[in-house]
Amino acid sequence: MSVANEESYRPSKATDATTEAVPPPMSYPQLFARFLKFGLLAWGGPVAQIDMLRRELVDEERWISSKRFNKLLAVMQVLPGPEAHEICVHLGIRAKGRLGGVLAGLGFMLPGFLLMFALSWLYFQIEFVGTALGAAFLGVQAAVIALIVRAVHRIGEHILLDRWLWVIAIVCALAAIGRVDFWITLPAGGLVYALLVLNHRASALLVTLAAVALAAAVALWAAPTAKLVEAVVQGQASVLLIFASGLKAGLLTFGGAYTAIPFVRNDAVGRGWMTDGQFLDGLALSGVLPAPLIIFATFVGYVAGGPIGAVAMTVGVFLPAFAFSLIFYDRLEAVVENKRLHAFLDGVAAGVVGLIGATTIDLAQVTAERVPSLTVGMSIFAAGLAFLYAWKNKLNVVVVILAAGLAGWLVFPNQG
């Protein structure tokens, strides 16, 4: 579609005077610079980021009406991807067509990407083992577990709205602990919930039994070939494979960036690209940056494949966030109105919550084994979790990570 045709996406002034708000006239560089500023100020996670966008672009400048913004937010919360970034892309399209959407999305993500890229490079220039900095990162890793636990709670509050969604989440968590692949549990969870919403309980039971049978068949087939597969995939990190890993995570981030954690970890740690300790360090670094937390994928890509790997992973993770708005701009609101599709996505999202819970247990076990003192590690975890709930501020994550690093430096000297 040409840029001229894309301008038709903008409502007319007459429409603005009667029913709808309109973005102000601006050039493409001005649009990019505006969202670059938002990216530089994107502290505090999605809630703070969305609040910033709402305050400036809805309440103050009326790029879009409050009612339509709320509906747009509801759509973005159903679809995979970081909501704040997707809203930026959508508003960029509203202002200057699809090219405007690309520029708005790039502006919002670029500061976080460049900062994480620089930190990833610095991470490998510094000695950690047996140093005070290594000890500080042990403290930080305990705090990261607290961040994930709080995220599971907050995401679950918005997704697990009835008993069946709770059941799906618990079953998917148990299945993940039992090493059942997500490509079995998540579609099954979505189908089962959609059928239950339609009151087709017999069909839901059949889908459940089919999923159990498939999981058993895969387990039986995989058992004799597991060592062969492990030998093939261990350490391999081609650019295409890194990109595919990021794309998979980007397509499955229902409910926020934290939901990408189990999928990225499954590939990065499972394939031998990095250790769990490095994975937790990447999460910690992303927590102190003005960016969507999913920017930790840049660090994972850097560890797996250097600078090119960092770019490949980042492109893969963010591609769905661009694509949904760019391709389906006019039809996104229909997602909320389609009850069957909405129910399926709700079931998948509930399953993802279960996967995060299972991954949190795994990461907590790894951290417990790494810290020199389990008591001190648990104390840092408990203090960080309590602070996150007690202090409602967009910088609370940054403060917790820095404080945990200081605590690790003080109590785990030369233990990194």
UniProtKB/Swiss-Prot annotation:
Keywords: Cell inner membrane, Cell membrane, Chromate resistance, Membrane, Plasmid, Transmembrane, Transmembrane helix, Transport
Gene Ontology molecular function: any one: chromate transmembrane transporter activity
A single GO BP: response to chromate
Positions of the UniProt region annotated as Disordered: 1-21
Keyword Cell inner membrane in record: yes
Membrane topology label: Multi-pass membrane protein
Functional description taken from the UniProt entry: This protein reduces chromate accumulation and is essential for chromate resistance.
Protein name stated in the entry: Chromate transport protein
Organism: Pseudomonas aeruginosa
